Amino acid sequence: MKVRTRIAPSPTGFPHVGTAYIALFNLCFAKQHGGEFILRIEDTDQLRSTPESEQMILDSLRWLGLNWSEGPDVGGPHAPYRQSERMGIYKQYALDLIEKGHAFYCFATAEELDQMRAEQQARGETPKYDGRGLKLSQEEVERRLAAGEPHVIRMKVPEEGICKFNDLLRGEVEIPWAQVDMQVLLKTDGLPTYHLANVVDDHLMEITHVLRGEEWLPSAPKHQLLYQYFGWDMPTLCHMPLLRNPDKSKLSKRKNPTSINYYRDIGVLPEALLNYLGRMGWSMPDEREVFTLTDMIEHFDIQRVSLGGPIFDVDKLNWLNGQWIKSLTPGQLLDRLLSWKSDRQTLEDIATAIQPRINLLSEAVNWAGFYFNHMPNITAEMFESKKLSPEQVRQSLQFAIWRLESQFTWNNETVSQILMDLANQMDIKLRDFMPAFFIAIAGSTSSTPVMQSMVTIGPDLTFARLRRALEIVGAPSKKELKVWEKLNESLKLPKNETVDNT
């Protein structure tokens, strides 16, 4: 049996270092066993999935050197490799489960399910589906289907007993069936949920080993049941430890930049980032810290993965990147520097911004430096304003982050409109609103136009600089966050409308 592993990202955001981490271990496991590593795009969430996100994911993984033998961009014997192009496949499998008695129709409305969960919580119970669809007679089901009532298809789950499955790192895992919900397999719009599409595709694409994050452990019983219901062999499971911040919390963009593009943009070498991800819970047999992808594949043993949450420490990554830089010849370093900022359009944008401000070419260094720096040197005192209160400064930065993060169209028109709308909704004059953004992005109020600067440096560096500025002036507490989220939404409403802030 040929080993086949896969990475199956969802194109709903910027490419995450966690995706690269899981992809790396899947690739090493497959190659160490003489197998194949494939890439599949799981874009069943049609509302949030975008072609731009998919392309960024493919580009960032390629940049790292994580190459796949089958995928949406290279094809293969199991094409298509986008779930959105496989939609005709899944419904029949869901209907087959109905025929075999392993799944059932549910006609409960969203309001009925909300009421069900509220009543369960009031009784001190963990909210879960109560099986009401199982109580319907065949005649009633057929009548409601014929009437065209909206419905979903759910899988049946045992009410008692223990689900047992083996994990490469954890041995035998036991999860009570009482903790497993009757998962929706096919939604009211006829589209599959992650669980159905994932299992069907892994089987049809002959995946033999599934290496994924440990957050999917609670889903393993559902997947095991589906494999049993279909009569298929289940792939060997391996749930990898999650990457964590230095404070041991789950890695999140609030505390550490998580986009692969961010690390590329600040000048981390792809070999160094891949090397660092390879050290996340794993080590070379000789404990060396600097190694290549080829080295890792050659010496890879999944049993060397530690289940302790690996810490993603940016300072350690920077140190390791320094080791890789120091190993280059001066000529190689020059090539890397030139390729790092070689995009002619970006350089033209910078030249356009600084041209009205310089009389000598040598003056370009001072005006353009912040475009290339990792982070500007800023202090809390720099954000003190005679026009805005400290809370207004903090809120303007946080609200801008939230609104900008929701955009995939990153151009001057979009960024400018978001910031101008926010200033207007907060009832702040634009000339009083913008200094905080000049300081956060450029480190000074004397700078090139900041909205265009944000476009030029790109979303990842923009978010990182805005978050750092927010940390310096005072990031919101958990209690404040809840209030601010509602306030931010209420600001978007017409002046005569409000939201409940209780």
Swiss-Prot record:
It catalyses: tRNA(Glu) + L-glutamate + ATP = L-glutamyl-tRNA(Glu) + AMP + diphosphate. GO terms for biological process: glutamyl-tRNA aminoacylation. Its EC number is 6.1.1.17. Keywords: Aminoacyl-tRNA synthetase, ATP-binding, Cytoplasm, Ligase, Nucleotide-binding, Protein biosynthesis. InterPro entries: aa-tRNA-synth_I_cd-bd, aa-tRNA-synth_I_codon-bd_sub2, aa-tRNA-synth_I_CS, aa_tRNA-synth_I_cd-bd_sf, Glu-tRNA-ligase_bac/mito, Glu/Gln-tRNA-synth, Glu/Gln-tRNA-synth_Ib_cat-dom, GluQ/Sye. It is an enzyme of class 6 (ligase). Pfam families: Anticodon_2, tRNA-synt_1c. One of its GO terms (molecular function) is glutamate-tRNA ligase activity. A motif ('HIGH' region) lies at residues 9-19. Coiled coil: none annotated. Catalyzes the attachment of glutamate to tRNA(Glu) in a two-step reaction: glutamate is first activated by ATP to form Glu-AMP and then transferred to the acceptor end of tRNA(Glu). Monomer. Belongs to the class-I aminoacyl-tRNA synthetase family. Glutamate--tRNA ligase type 1 subfamily. HAMAP family: Glu_tRNA_synth_type1. This is Glutamate--tRNA ligase.
